[in-house]
Curated annotation (Swiss-Prot):
SMART domains per the UniProt record, alphabetical: Arg_tRNA_synt_N (SM01016), DALR_1 (SM00836)
Stored CDD domains: ArgRS_core
GO annotation, cellular component aspect: cytoplasm
Family annotation (InterPro entries): aa-tRNA-synth_I_CS, Arg-tRNA-ligase, Arg-tRNA-synth_N, Arg-tRNA-synth_N_sf, ArgRS_core, DALR_anticod-bd, Rossmann-like_a/b/a_fold, tRNAsynth_Ia_anticodon-bd
Classification via Gene3D superfamilies: Arginyl tRNA synthetase N-terminal domain, HUPs, Isoleucyl-tRNA Synthetase, Domain 1
Gene designation per UniProt: argS
Subunit record text: Monomer.
Identification of the protein by name: Arginine--tRNA ligase
GO molecular function annotation: arginine-tRNA ligase activity; ATP binding
Catalyzed reactions: tRNA(Arg) + L-arginine + ATP = L-arginyl-tRNA(Arg) + AMP + diphosphate
Motif 'HIGH' region per record, residues: 130-140
One of the protein's GO biological processes: arginyl-tRNA aminoacylation
UniProt keyword annotations, A-Z: Aminoacyl-tRNA synthetase, ATP-binding, Cytoplasm, Ligase, Nucleotide-binding, Protein biosynthesis
Length: 554
């Protein structure tokens, strides 16, 4: 249990004990303490006096006074108590307890903030999963940044996390890709060939065709069906190699790359189909096979096998989720990050897992809303260089990996977001990622100066000299790090991390502007050096959750 939770729990226990000691109730109702919106109203506040009115048969103000009179302030770590309004009890803590976070951070270092108690829950997070038919764009970039950050947060909070990319390599879009590459191959070999109407016209397809013409001239002599099969596989291989490199450069990592074709090769689709039939959730109508998803809150049943006997795109997805739930000893939770165009897909997919006996609540789906790239107040839709949609690679080249990841994680995924590319490149306090990284670099500079004076961070410094209000506010932020991670994990909210980073950096800058770290007072200097080292560890670990670097020089 982290320091903040420990202090809060102790306060609750002491309030409960004082209620009993005052004879207000034999069975004490649950005591709730909240952080007041206005810091002037204390560190914590409780409404227990009003809750006890009917039980104690006294007015809440009298009850509050009785609780205060019987409270052991020393045990509760309370410095001052005020009764406000009809009977709210406001507690002002002795904030020296916060200094305990300094040696904890120094000792744990890279593990500071991580939950030491495992959740014993396996979570598989699937994100990006773009079709291997072209470059990644800004929507995929947001999905990558949010998915990777969410996975980092869940891991830090104690979940057993698996990160996965689903390769859609068995559908019609891959057939179109193969025909497109075949046409470009033939053109490169000197043959006049038209691209299919629904083909892919990107420059990368031209390059693949030219490359294959140079390296694999023998393909022109293969029978048509064999040739198309080769082009399918080579096309997917080329595109996936490019996507993997872009994602790796974007600090986005996966534990597994799951190919849709394996569902066919291993008979997973037929297995799941039989299971759903046995469970009574399929039926025949109009020459097609339907899945009875309306039994589980979908707005209509869904076709899974068409009249011609071919599968709809929905059936492999159903089989894929069955595989995910049952793989590696079984997953407790699946989290999917989908693009905004998949909103209508949520109910049918959640309904489908119910048909083979999985509680739909174990499948969580987050929708990534649209991102607009903005430059000089105008939306940028096309690349000036290529005339096509702006790619992830171009965004990384334009604003840098750190800025791209940070900006794309700053807002809740279910909200639309304008990405100001000019702001992302600014070296100013207005740029949130620069502001955060500058705090880290500034601490490095101070620690270097301290080291030159022979002063290094110490877990055994006398922290009682830390009394400055700005220093206490800074320590409060450090102490909130682990609870923030727990909250971000529980609510699947990566943007809470970037919000926290901004608050921590702001608290540090305010402290820095209000007091000096390096002075002639050796005891205070030692304490402050140790404190800002703890702040730096916290800032570095928080930035790492977002996949952003923590530079020592800027």
């Amino acid at each position: 249990m982290n320091i903040i939770d420990q202090v809060k729990q102790t306060l609750i226990e002491e309030i409960t004990a004082s209620v009993k000691a005052a004879g207000l109730a034999e069975e004490v109702p649950e005591v709730k303490v909240e952080i007041p919106k206005d810091p002037k109203n204390g560190d914590y506040s409780t409404n227990i006096a009003m809750v006890l009115t009917k039980i104690a048969k006294r007015n809440p103000h009298e009850i509050a006074q009785a609780i205060v009179d019987h409270l052991d302030k020393s045990k509760a770590n309370v410095e001052k108590i005020e009764i406000a309004g009809p009977g709210f009890i406001n507690f002002y803590l002795n904030n020296q307890y916060l200094t305990a976070v300094i040696p904890e951070a120094l000792e744990k270092d890279k593990d500071f903030g991580r939950n030491e108690d495992p959740k014993h829950q396996k979570v598989l997070v699937e994100y990006v999963s773009a079709n291997p038919t072209g470059d990644l764009h800004i929507g995929h970039a947001r999905n990558a940044a949010v998915g990777d950050t969410l996975s980092n947060i869940l891991d830090a909070a104690g979940y057993d996390v698996t990160r996965e990319y689903y390769i859609n390599d068995a559908g019609n879009q891959i057939t179109n890709l193969a025909h497109s590459i075949e046409a470009r191959y033939d053109q490169a070999m000197g043959k006049e060939t038209e691209l299919p109407a629904d083909g892919y016209y990107g420059k990368d397809i031209i390059n693949i065709g030219k490359d294959l013409a140079e390296k694999r001239p023998e393909l022109k002599d293969l029978p048509e069906d064999e040739r198309l099969k080769v082009f399918r596989q080579l096309g997917v291989d080329y595109e996936m190699e490019k996507l993997k490199k872009d994602l790796a450069d974007f600090n986005t990592h996966f534990d597994g790359w799951f190919s849709e074709t394996t569902l066919y090769d291993k008979g997973e689709i037929k297995k799941v189909l039989e299971l759903m039939k046995e469970n009574g959730y399929t039926y025949e109508a109009d020459g097609a096979t339907w899945l009875r998803t309306t039994d589980f809150n979908d707005d209509k049943d869904r076709v899974i096998i068409k009249k011609d006997g071919s599968y709809t795109y929905f059936l492999p997805d159903v089989a894929y989720h069955y595989d995910k739930f049952h793989r590696d000893g079984g997953q407790d939770i699946l989290i999917n990050l989908f693009g905004a165009d998949h909103h209508g897909y949520i109910n049918r997919l959640k309904a489908s897992v119910e048909t083979y006996g999985i509680d739909a609540d174990r499948l969580e789906i987050q929708i990534m809303q649209m991102v607009r790239l903005m430059q000089d107040g105008e939306e940028v839709k096309m690349s000036k260089r290529t005339g096509n949609a702006i790619t992830l690679r171009e965004i990384m080249d334009e604003v840098g990996i750190d800025a791209a990841r940070y900006f794309l994680t700053m807002r809740s995924p279910d909200t639309h977001f304008d990405f100001d590319m000019e702001l992302a490149k600014e070296n100013s306090a207005e740029n949130p990622v620069y502001y955060a990284q500058y705090a880290h670099a500034r601490i490095s500079s101070i620690l270097k100066q301290a080291g030159e004076r022979g002063i290094t961070p110490s877990e055994n410094a006398d922290f009682s000299v830390i009394t400055n209000d700005k220093a206490i506010d800074l320590l409060k932020k450090v102490a909130e790090f682990e609870p923030m991670i727990e909250s971000a994990a529980e609510h699947r909210a990566p943007h809470r991390v970037t919000n926290y980073i901004q608050e921590l950096a702001s608290a540090f800058h305010k402290f820095y502007n209000a007091d000096k770290v390096l002075t002639d007072d050796e005891k205070k200097t030692q304490a402050y050096v140790s404190m800002i080292a703890a702040v730096q560890i916290t800032l570095r670990n928080a930035l790492a959750l977002v996949g952003v670097s923590a530079p020592h020089n800027m």
